[in-house]
Amino acid sequence: MKQKKVKMMSKTIAVHCGHGVSLDGSWDSGCVYKGYSEAKLMLAITKAAVKYLRASGVKVQSDADHGNNKNMIADVRQANNSGVAMYLSIHCDYSGAPRGVMPLYVSGSGKKLAKCLEKTIKKDMGMKSRGVQKRTDLWELNGTDMTACILETGSIKGDLATLRDHPDKYGKAIAKGVCSYLGVPFKDGKKKPSKDIYHVRKTWKDEKSQKGAFSTLENAKKCADKNGYSVFNSKGKEVYHGKK
């Protein structure tokens, strides 16, 4: 099977949540443990991953947008028909599985994606890894026409606290791994606070009296004390009155 290598950020990728609606339309919870289901746990993580990927400028196709309402056959068909550049399916392993993340792949490009995911998840989540593993018996790997990876995020029993309590953090780690694979700078969507400039003047309107403009308030205060002037922020508000 020849799989495409992603070359540009403008390509759309598919990120889907494991299990959910089954082939006959009934609900497929995936593995379960003490009232927790794979489908529900993975939905929260997938939503977070999609959120951070979109914040990083990546176009994402995902069943998480609609409550995990499609089965994997439909997910793969949609991905193939729309020509997405990459396919990722997010799962967790059954209660008897060992702890640790385990990305699955079948192609060379899939292995590269798996390693990117393993690296960021181990680092950001502090999780053990069961290694990246090649599988040739899974539909989401064999049926896709593009780079594909099935991510086993951990054991529903052994890693329950991580999966249940930190979905946003886990989704962020996944998004970082995907961005690393795509060669796209990761962005968390948070606007960095703008740095204010502090002006030392007699009054805000008296621009000619300005003794200096500073990026730090402490330095502006020293200048104001020396000259008996005031400190104004970029909006003209007096934030400090000199002591001289």
Model-based region annotation:
Residues 2-74:
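Active-site histidine-acidic residue metal-binding/catalytic motifs
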Residues 10-11, 53-60, 82-87, 124-128, ...:
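Loop/turn elements at helix/coil->beta-strand transitions in domains of secreted/extracellular proteins
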Residues 14-16, 22-24, 80-82, 86-93, ...:
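Active-site-adjacent mobile loop/cap segments within catalytic or ligand-binding domains
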Residues 20-37, 93-120, 124:
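A short, glycine/acidic-enriched catalytic loop
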Residues 44, 48-54, 110-126, 160-190:
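Long, well-ordered alpha-helical scaffolding segments within enzyme catalytic domains
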Residues 193-208, 229:
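Short aromatic-glycine-(Arg/Gly/Cys) micro-motifs in beta-strand/loop hairpins
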Residues 215-230:
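A short, charged, amphipathic alpha-helix used as a generic interaction element across diverse proteins
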Residues 228-244:
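Short, mixed-charge low-complexity intrinsically disordered segments
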